[in-house]
Amino acid sequence: MSRRHSAVKREVLPDPKFGDVVISRFMNVLMYDGKKSVAESIVYGALDSLKKRGGQNADPVRLFHEALDNVKPAIEVRSRRVGGATYQVPVEVRSERRQALAIRWIIESARKRGEHTMEDRLSNELLDAVNNRGAAVKKREDTHRMAEANKAFSHYRW
């Protein structure tokens, strides 16, 4: 990894339906083998079913962002070698990484669910995340619990 230049952040274009950059980024993480149209149909289908379940005045984009906010971790542990021992040091998570982790965790836990289509899995996982339950929220809680347990090593921060 080069120390001279940091990689330039690529600009992600907003999605065509809602004009939201975060939804576009979510689609890019969900996408397999460059099949963006498949990822789009899954995400839009999941957001449509969220709208149907939320009532007539439910905004699917607002629910999506609420689900993401409920999954975003505030703190995580990173390994730090001191002497011969490796310590799990709790560190605060940068905002970009928070979003990336939340997106990744929601998609991972949606893929592990038992519903028939990915659209259903994703909409149910997002609904669970809005209501502060589900596998993605549990992952965030586990991360926070791990950081809390290793609070004693927080002075090893870098």
UniProtKB/Swiss-Prot annotation:
Keywords of the record: Ribonucleoprotein, Ribosomal protein, RNA-binding, rRNA-binding, tRNA-binding
Gene Ontology biological process terms in this record: translation
GO molecular function: rRNA binding; structural constituent of ribosome; tRNA binding
SUPFAM superfamilies with a match to the protein in the record: Ribosomal protein S7
PROSITE patterns: RIBOSOMAL_S7 (PS00052)
Top-level taxon in the UniProt lineage: Bacteria
UniProt key word Disulfide bond: no
UniProt keyword Protein biosynthesis, yes or no: no
Function: One of the primary rRNA binding proteins, it binds directly to 16S rRNA where it nucleates assembly of the head domain of the 30S subunit. Is located at the subunit interface close to the decoding center, probably blocks exit of the E-site tRNA.
NCBIfam families assigned to the protein according to its UniProt record, in alphabetical order: rpsG_bact
Protein name as catalogued: Small ribosomal subunit protein uS7
Annotated source species: Acidiphilium cryptum (strain JF-5)
